[in-house]
Amino acid sequence: MAKLARASALQFGANVTQTFVGAIITIYVINELGVGAFGIFALSAALVKWASIPAVGIRGAVITRMNESDDISPSEYFTTASVLTGAIILVGLLALLGYSPFVEQYLDYSGTQLVGGMFVSNVSFRLVLGGLRGENRVEMSSLYEALWGILSSLVKLALVYTGVGVDALFYGEITSSIVIGIFGVYSLNISFVSPTRSAAISLYSWARYGWLDNLKRMSYSWLDTIILGFFVSTSLVGIYEVAWRISALFVLLPTAISKSTFPTISSLRDTDKLNKVRRILTRGLSVAGVLAIPGLVGSVLVGGDILALYGPSVSSVGVAVSVLVSLSVVRLVECYETLVMQALNALDLPDRTFRIGVIFITTNIILNVSLIPMFGVIGAAIATLLSMTLGSILAVRALPKAVQTLPPVSAIGSQFVSAGAMAVVLFTILNYRPIGQPIEVVLYVLAGATTYGFVLLSLSSNFRERVQQLLSESLG
């Protein structure tokens, strides 16, 4: 468990670093270029993610298969996956360039080549990270992921400062993927060998189901953005993406836990140790909402002030705060769904995840297509919330009986009570002195977080023990 705690802590630290650095750069970029330029990049990123779905399925298969002990070596798996991914990249790139007039009209941006470059470099880099996770080197993968985010942000900052414009956002992603990807390849403990048919079949047997879960993830994260691009301006798409990225902070902890526990749960699925899997899942669920619950409260009280940091192109739009609050609710549900779905994937139950994926994707498409034309960006948030809630219920019901666990009501209740105390403190301070300067936004958020943390530590002995255990195991 010590190794698992260290891996989770490092993954969480990497996610926090990447998110905060990215947020600072995003604030600068939007203030310089406007939220419309950021909306163009968000739509481009959505296209890249959707084009990457087949490759993501291969990457998931690599992580799972390299963790297994069978007659096929990790080197065979990774090499074969590299060849398959290369073929996917070629097809996707040809399609993207072949339909470039339509793509440029949709994006309102004449830079299809840069979109293609981001697609190629991102897919390749993510495969390398998958190889490291397949070797159960979560710490190394987390480190490279954080470095990727930092380098990408710094390149964007430098190029925007020198007047490159929206192209800078693409160059940042491409440069970082290439540079950090090269270091990642050299860190792999595998040799490149001839691809084998048996490895391809084994990868396919997992990916044919696993890709649908990835499609589900993409549907959750990017389908609303794609559909918004047909009905609203790039500025509104940019505002939606800003709110989505702010609320992303709330799911950093469950994301880190799920990534770190995946190899461990995967290694236990063929044994009689499913009770251990249940304990891992219960522990994860007890802390999954630690950031999302106070984050939701904070978005209601100071969400408008946080959005004001991004400049008038964001804060002047009346719907911006409502979008942030709505997406904060979505993120709260996602915290718990993430852990349960990752457990299903790690337990190698592709038939169950397949059914959940089909239902989620169908529901999400129908709701987005129905609600976005009527309610715009708010409709996208509502559609995502309803789809995620349904997916969470189905995921819990799909868990094997030996793994199913009751929700840790006491732990979650303590988090809500602590968030309530935080709300009282923040509301009192805001009534006494409303926020007037950007630095006050940071100070008020820190005051709220401190209040929440102290109250939670005093109320929840289990959370206090978890923190002490994590610090002990991570530092020891």
UniProtKB/Swiss-Prot annotation:
Pathway the protein contributes to: Cell surface structure biogenesis; S-layer biogenesis
Keyword list, A-Z: Cell membrane, Membrane, Transmembrane, Transmembrane helix
Database matches in InterPro entries: Poly_Biosynth_Transport
Cell compartments where the protein resides: Cell membrane
GO CC annotation terms, alphabetical: plasma membrane
GO biological process, one term: S-layer organization
Membrane topology: Multi-pass membrane protein
Major location (coarse): membrane
Main function: Involved in the assembly of a N-linked pentasaccharide that decorates the S-layer glycoprotein and flagellins. Probably mediates or contributes to the translocation of the dolichol-phosphate-mannose across the membrane.
Family in the record: Belongs to the AglR/Agl15 family.
Database matches in PANTHER family: POLYSACCHARIDE BIOSYNTHESIS PROTEIN, PST FAMILY PREDICTED COLANIC ACID TRANSPORTER
Annotated protein name in UniProt: Probable flippase AglR
Lineage, highest ranks first: Archaea, Methanobacteriati, Methanobacteriota, Stenosarchaea group, Halobacteria
